[in-house]
Amino acid sequence: YTESISGLEKLRMSKYVQSKIGLSFIHTENFLKKGKIVMFVGTPCQIHGLKLFLRKDYENLITVDFVCHGVPSPKIWKIYLNKTAKTNDIKQISFRNKKLGWENFSFVLQYKKQKSLSETLRKNPYLRGFIHDIYLRPCCYVCKNKSFKSGSDFTLADFWGIKNTYPNLYDKNGISCLTINTIHGMEIFPNMNIQGTQ
């Protein structure tokens, strides 16, 4: 988690791996009980899990999920990484580098001492398997939290099809979509500093 604007940088960008919840729910509850405003962002199942853990609503909690494709098996990621790179030599990983645009994104592995590995979606075996649902977690295939059922205040998504709906807003680096799902979200939204079109 982060309590600073500068800390948000590490949380940005797509991460096509399973996240570790660890003590996140406990930290969230502690912050909420102290009266701090908490924005919890996670997969739909993580939002649902947090709500079950908390067992009550908090006015100072804002929950955000995203349209989730599913989560790949951590074992597959580990195998891929071990075959592709020495993990102690990795500087940064980008699962969705947009140098070629958001419709033809690339997997980029930056090393500390050697040339970076850059492969498009069509060439990278890890991304291909993920996009084609070959190695998602078994629970993802029967997810009960997808389709706006997690109880989140907001849902984020890529605005695929914007070329057809709002062609004048199209951007080769992508456009995001924000959906308000709850009354709490409707109350919060006017106070948010968001650039965009409603």
Say what each PLM segment does.
Residues Y1-Q198:
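Iron-sulfur-associated redox domains of electron-transfer enzymes in respiratory
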